[in-house]
Amino acid sequence: MTPFLRPEARKANLWSQLASTRKTMLSNPFTRLSALLLLSAAPAFAQINGVGQRPYLGWSSFSEQTINSSFLTQANITTQSDALAASGLQAHGFAYINIDSGWQGSFDANGRPIPNATTFPDIKALVDHIHGNGQKAGIYWIPGVEYPAVAANSPILGTQYYIQDILAVPYTAGNAFGAPGTSPYHYKIDFAKPGAQEYMNSVVALFASWGIDYIKLDGVTPGSDSYGLSIDNRADVAAWSKAIAVSGRPIWLTISWALDQDYLSVWQQYANARRVDQDVECEGGCATLTDWPRIYERFRDLPGWENASGPEIGWNDLDTLDISDGPIDGLTNEEKRSALSFWALVNAPITLGGDLTKIDDFGKTLVSNDEALAVGQTGKPAKQVLDGDVEVYVSDLGNGAYNVGIFNMDAVVTHARIPWSLLGFADAVDVRDLWTHREVGPALGGFSTTLEGHGSRLLRVYGIGHAAPAPSTSYEAESAVLGGSAVIASCPACSGGEKVGGLGLGAGNKVTFNNVYVETAGEYLMQVDSMTQGLRSYLYSVDGGAYQTLDCGGGSFFLPASTTVPVYLQKGFNTIAFGSPVSYPPDLDKIAISGNGDFPRPASNTYEAEVATLGGTVIGEFSNYSSGLGKAGNIGGGAANSVTFSNVTVPSTGTYQLEIDYQTSGVRSYFMSVNGGAETELDLNGSTFSDPVPTVIPVQLHAGTNTISFGNASGYAPDLDRIVVAPSY
């Protein structure tokens, strides 16, 4: 048997695993960092296999497999290859046809995986067909050796050794899919033993004999929801890379999934790309291939990896792009355009999912836009310069040219003004919209735009003049006031050599900066240097005000990543507190406040349901894909079981946009009341209680503070993630 979908039990236990990992790291921070430092001097030779100078473009079978369990057959892969050839997309660079998990049926006389004879009767003929279409063929496998090959104890090709001779003793799991104990099904290889590398060479030689051009090595640890060294596939990754070099065939190697950044030097040295996230597909968790929260996860994770990508050190793989099959993709057209813009900006491989025979007109227009696709081939991955409701990414191409992405992370329409000083220059002599192919500049001082919900702009900007860095003051977390379980821990890569962990899961478990001083009241930029593996969020408060949300992600508890958000500060001393009542935030290194108080103020305000006033049976609870990693549940079924936002503040009386991010499986209703007025019924539908879905309605508010309540006296209401209030445009 081969793994197909990720074992749901592993995902269900992810949060408890992270909590355990967190405690281990705080008590012994050198356990993994020492290994990281030993490896930091390793030379990068990810390109020794002759590929990987630029991210590839292609298609993968996995997304379609998640909604059609019988999809993975030779006949269907042949059809997809023919569809790619007929689509015209190869002229735009799409070349790879990648077969994911489930193709293998047994093992040959030398313990090497061979195809299922029923579903893949002639894989060499299939690969020849793919090559005949002018494409490249990819295949999936995993580290270690599976039980049938171990039980057969087959001889290793060209050696005197047998499969059992190369296994780690005592027997233990050889990848993230392996069971605990000494009967793991997926057995670990000991690469210090003779015959081990030769076995890997023989497997890759078999793939090469079929004509394979790409290998996805899945379940690699540290990573893949297993962040310790109990499995440790670093030696496997090195062995696969060496085997590819020995084969003499140019074969791209991608390792997967959610890799541990503490061992980045190994991943950079031996692989062309590494998956930095969980799967983008819902895999039964929603009714579509993917949805916006899964895309947003990539925006959260990427800042921690943004300095790790490039032509000689491999690429950050954000997983499949399901953007060309219409409604089954689970994304609006604006979301699809934003997703492709983001993948391109950060130079991630662009791997289409879904069924290539069903590409719709909008999807085909997206993936055949050569100006947008060229952004992904610059070899200069973009970096985030602004986080929050509007995110900005920029890639400096040299000679005054920049690729710039501006993203609206909310479902409301918003207006944004981006000062060019944020990007390091004063003015723009030319601005080109890469989606519309139109010149929209010059633009002095900055760029203003209106963005649809989850919409974006992808720009080529030619800047002139130098913008001097704004004055900045740093504040170390270990020097701030620690509350509750917050604790200082060693962190050699952190500013000052220390960090603060133990935050969250209680309102008192926080770190408070009491001495944040500015000369003038206004909007500043706050850089937050934090560390996490996977998704975590801060709920922070300025001067005792309402909670504000900073959603983060990453791949290390030892390597700080920076993200910057706008923050309003009063003249003089301010207090900023970081924590979260219902979830774990990232560990915190420091914050830095910069600017002169004149940064453009965000147009919208977010209010988290889990920290609103919860009545009756309503509870605030952890929710992995929700804003702030929390939501309010058990709403309705009684008049008292409601959520009340009592601090919704707007500058003037009028009609505003109200975004409601909810979670439900099936039809449920809210009864919403504004300022104690008559209730409005909102009938909502959804397919999951894990991934929030937005709806946007107009709402009349008066100047100052307003109250908005959600409940259902006679029936159950959806769970509630947050609301967003924004002006109407």
Locations of the language-model features?
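Aromatic-lined carbohydrate-recognition surfaces of secreted/lumenal glycan-active proteins
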Residues: K136-V150, S241-D262
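Conserved structural scaffold segments of CAZyme catalytic domains across common CAZy folds
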Residues: A42-K136, G144, N347-V385, A401, ...
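Glycan-recognition surfaces
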Residues: T172-G178, A192, V246-D355
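Carbohydrate-binding surface patches
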Residues: R337, W343-V346, T351-G353, L386-F425, ...
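Structural recognition of the beta-strand scaffold that forms the well-ordered cores
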Residues: P55-S61, G93-D100, K136-W141, D213-D218, ...
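Aromatic-lined carbohydrate-binding/catalytic grooves of carbohydrate-active enzymes
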Residues: Q65, Q80, L84-Y227
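Glycan-recognition and catalytic regions of carbohydrate-active enzymes
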Residues: N347-D410, P492-G504, T512, G572, ...
